[in-house]
Amino acid sequence: IIFLARRNILRLSRFWKAEMTAWPRLDANLILLGEIMLVTAILLMNSADTVLQQMGQEHYPSTGYLPVSGWLGPMLFSGWSADWLMWIERLGWWMHVLVVYGFIVYLSYSKHLHIFLAFPNTWFAKLRSRGEMSNMPVIMNELRSMLGLPSSGEAQTETDTNPEFGAKDIAGLSWKNILDAYTCTECGRCTAVCPANLTGKKLSPRKVMMDIRDRTEEVADKLHSGSEQYIRKDSRGEHVKLDISNFDDGLSLFDRITEEEINACTTCNACVEACPVLIDPLEPILQMRRYQILMESKGPAEWVPMFNALESSGSVWQVPEARSKWTEQLSEK
């Protein structure tokens, strides 16, 4: 009841952001109502059971001390007949069983799937420094070659001849990014501490995870259809079957997550620190930025001089001879 009031009467701001449309709010309320029904059913069952025990009815042996039901039963059902009490006890039992089974079936359609996914997601959370991006083998090998250094030793793949950097769609994200999206509880703690969101920008880390999950489900439904219309044109053929490697429906994550949103991110890691189940909304944002910069040569105009300076002089300030000067103040390890 308290949590329902927080969402619907007090209306805490993090529960009423733009991405919290009718369905996410209804989903949360349905679960809370189900929990209220479950607790009510258990209390009814145990309260009636307690009174039946006191009456010495057959098939109702002592179950031990029940602090709430032991007080509630005599208060509610004192003077009731045994037949009515048995009916109430059975009603409570069936009601709690149906709520539990209904909840299990509903889980696959609800954000409350995180009940099962929170532990594995936490277990597989990255242990390296937060905000650190993984290197791209193709680029690292090119850089090593340019600098006359030996190759990193990572094997070349078939896609290395025409690589795609970053993530345009869910196929460019890792399995952990997808797991993060399905583990999201939509609690809004990440968005509540996001400095970009707090200053009125459109970025909401929670919305990013919700959009990834929704896009994943959309792609999965189309893949399951097996329709040839979703096969990329240059991959179509007589015996070609639809799969994630040749999938193309003309849409992408950028149709859900705008450039304005991903460019508003300051990479401060506040969202990562705030998540109770160690979801990392920053990584998919950075992967989408990679695609935007490396594949489409897009980005805010303010970023262009920085990239040009890095390319020409290896320093954002275009002073290559002084770029390592700051290290002179550090003690040798």
Locations of the language-model features?
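Membrane-embedded alpha-helical bundles of multi-pass integral membrane proteins
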Residues: 1-154, 206, 210
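Catalytic cores of large soluble enzymes that bind and process phosphate-bearing ligands
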Residues: 83-86, 104-108, 176, 182, ...
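Beta-sheet entry/capping signal
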Residues: 2, 105, 113-114, 191-193, ...
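Non-transmembrane accessory domains of multi-pass membrane transporters/channels
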Residues: 131-202, 311, 315-331
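Short, glycine/proline-biased beta-turn/loop segments that scaffold the active-site neighborhood
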Residues: 212-214
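Iron-sulfur-cluster electron-transfer modules
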Residues: 2, 9, 172-175, 181, ...
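Glycine- and acidic
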Residues: 84, 101, 175-177, 189-196, ...
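Flexible gly/pro/ser-rich segments immediately N-terminal to CXXCH heme-c attachment motifs
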Residues: 22-23, 29, 86-94, 173-185, ...
